[in-house]
């Protein structure tokens, strides 16, 4: 099968198209003919070797976690999907390929495009997981750092829908977009963040969800009066040195939440913004954009 492969750790230039051995569904897995693959910042961090301590990767490797496509092979013990089902989920063999295997998938609603489907699994799970860990409730104020990105934009919507007052950070060009998602106020990230947040939220914030890094954790801690128990980052590896929780994955069964989010997107009640769709052969370009950190929404690759 055709796939994108990296056989060394490095920049986007480490990615190259290659013919590799076909993958097949094992027990509890399905094989998916890939219709679209989502690109996540974590893909670039794995490719660069920065995540080797946390997610050991054996080279050569096919990148990609988000996958959407049609089931064409079902492994032993799988009872909830059949060959021909349209699904989305988390690839275990790398999704930047003709075929991928996965054990965690849900059926794709008819109203959901392939591109939207591929944009949802990682971002949706991450957004909901950290909101649950923070325990934000109606009436509280949440600061979302990186509110225009794939994870941040979903976190803003999910929190606002639950009655949480959301303050988002984004570049100036994305302020209006973040307000459309449900944020009560938006400020520009960077130096002086704490002061800008206080201007728009003089009552303070109750929790901080850092999806983007950009050195925001010291400001987040300052805004919470020096405490770190309600600050969580998914992007800043300096978290441990600051006493902040770095959330890199969950232990809760993710499929029910994904199925619900997919339904909401299909019904137009939750927005998944696809920033750009590129052919699989341009995975290197997609990683260059993703590594830059300014995509408004999700990058998606299609065969």
Q: Language model features by range: what are they?
A:
Residues 11-14, 19-68:
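N-terminal glycine-rich beta->alpha transition that marks the start or flank
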Residues 68-91:
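A glycine-/small-residue-rich N-terminal strand-loop-strand element
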Residues 192-203:
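Short amphipathic alpha-helix with an adjacent loop that forms part of the alpha/beta core around
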Residues 211-273, 280, 303:
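Glycine-rich phosphate-binding loop and adjacent beta-alpha segment
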């Amino acid at each position: 099968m055709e796939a994108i492969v990296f056989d060394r750790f490095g920049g986007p230039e480490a990615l190259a198209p290659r013919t590799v051995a076909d993958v097949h569904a094992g027990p509890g897995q399905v094989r998916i003919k890939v219709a679209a693959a989502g690109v996540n910042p974590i893909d670039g961090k794995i490719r660069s070797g920065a995540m080797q301590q946390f997610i050991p990767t054996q080279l050569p490797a096919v990148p990609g976690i988000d996958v959407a496509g049609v089931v064409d092979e079902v492994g032993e013990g799988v009872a909830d999907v059949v060959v021909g089902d349209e699904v989305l989920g988390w690839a275990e063999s790398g999704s930047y390929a003709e075929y991928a295997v996965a054990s965690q998938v849900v059926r794709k609603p008819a109203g959901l495009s392939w591109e939207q489907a591929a944009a949802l699994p990682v971002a949706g799970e991450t957004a909901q997981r950290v909101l649950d860990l923070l325990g934000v409730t109606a009436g509280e104020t949440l600061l979302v750092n990186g509110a225009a990105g794939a994870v941040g934009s979903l976190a803003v919507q999910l929190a606002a829908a639950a009655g949480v007052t959301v303050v988002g950070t984004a570049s100036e060009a994305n302020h209006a977009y973040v307000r459309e998602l449900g944020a009560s106020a938006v400020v520009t990230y960077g130096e002086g963040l704490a002061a800008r947040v206080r201007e728009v939220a003089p009552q303070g914030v109750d929790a901080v969800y850092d999806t983007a890094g950009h050195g925001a954790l010291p400001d987040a801690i300052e805004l919470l009066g020096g405490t770190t128990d309600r600050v969580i980052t998914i992007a800043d590896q300096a978290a441990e040195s600051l006493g902040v929780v770095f959330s890199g994955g969950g232990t809760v069964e993710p499929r029910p939440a994904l199925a619900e989010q997919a339904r909401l997107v299909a019904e137009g009640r939750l927005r998944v913004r696809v920033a750009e769709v590129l052919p699989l052969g341009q995975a290197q370009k997609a990683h260059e954009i993703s590594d830059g950190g300014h995509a408004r929404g999700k990058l998606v690759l299609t065969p």
